Amino acid sequence: MNSLRSVKRLLGARSLSSDGLSESVNSSDREDSLSFQTPSTPSEDEMPQCFEDLIKPQVLSSEASKSLLSLNEGIKMEIVSSLQQKDQKKRNKLIAWMRKKPCYEQPDDFISYIVNTKIDSIDESIIHKLALLLRNEQVIWVEKFIHNGGFGVVFCTIDKISRLEWREELHDSILEQLLLCVKAMCTVQRGLECLSQSTYNVERLISLLLSKKQPCDFVVREVLVQIVHSFYKAHLDKEEGAMQVFSLFSIKDDKDEEVEFLKNVRVDRPFRRWIIELEDVSRNVFWVWNHDSNVIDLEKQYNQVYEAPLGFIGGIETEATSYVAAHIHLINELLEGLPLEKRQRKRLELQLSGLERIMGLRFRKSSQKFHKKLHEALREWIVAAKIDDWPYKLVQTGST
């Protein structure tokens, strides 16, 4: 009997793993193939062939195969019948689970699910489906989701996840999908209006981006920057929007607690925390900045849409430089929205914080062939600086 159990365990584990859940994941389209049929026990004439078919897929030595084939016919029939019953039970459970799983289609369904589900129990696939619907559905569907409170619910959940002391991989995955939901909602006017009135929420996102709890993936961090960019674009008064974003990125020190002589010698670097984030990226992918002789061509338009060679598709280098480019594009647009006097003041503050140094001594050295998006952002900065008579040679050539 012990040998019989061993054979069942061996064949059952291997055969069921090969055709278990993987063949029946496609919900209602596959229910017909997983019908509740009573397992039919093979006849004595069919038994040898049926048992051989069961043995063939297994990775067994020739001696083990011969030993199994030499078993008594009664034992063979019992093994096959037992495995068929186990397989049918597994299929029945799967179909029952598929029928019980709720179908989320309407905006209120998703809002109710997010509100009534604990963070640890949220299904990432449902939030992913919501992000896809917000991006691809009609405008009226997205506006209904926002009108019914979806915008606030999504931001509230993001805030809860960002406040967790220890975030797991599941939390980061859900956070990414929720951020994509916010990004998708910003494609409609109603979403931009809500975002422009959500200064506190945007401040929380920036704090998350520049904190030690920031998402690990550069792609997720880039989505955060894009949401901040949308927050700026949502302002009708570009000067007011630019100053507000700059204030959110600046360091808020309590200067009243400083000693008087320290105030006199202290150099104000309001965006130092922002630039440190870019410096950390340059250290994490240090091997990218190895083209010392690069010079940014002001006349050349770097085509950002190109076919990258194999090995540079979706690599960490591409993600890192794309993330850095998103920051520089944001800075360029913020500066463009300010009058000349305020723009020069912000340029000086960014320079003292270390932006120009890292652009000229690090980002300029990335490959012009493989990281065109970053070089286009640098070119835009240099062209704007040249128009304003601001020194730009350090960024263009790496030397003054």
Curated annotation (Swiss-Prot):
GO MF entry, a single one: actin binding
Cellular component, GO annotation: cell division site; cell tip; cytosol
Per the record, the GO terms for biological process are: actin cytoskeleton organization
The superkingdom of the source organism is Eukaryota
Q: Where in the cell is it found?
A: Cytoplasm
Q: Does the keyword Cytoplasm apply?
A: yes
**InterPro entries named in the record:** Actin_filament_regulator, ARM-like, ARM-type_fold, GTPase-bd
Q: Where are the residues of the annotated region Disordered?
A: 16-47
One Pfam family from the record: Drf_GBD
Q: Which UniProt keywords apply?
A: Cytoplasm
**Which segments constitute the GBD/FH3 domain?**
39-400
Which PANTHER family does this chain map to? Answer: PROTEIN BNI1
Q: What protein does this entry describe?
A: GTPase-binding protein rid1
Naturally occurring in which organism (per UniProt):
Schizosaccharomyces pombe (strain 972 / ATCC 24843)
Provide the gene name from the record. rid1
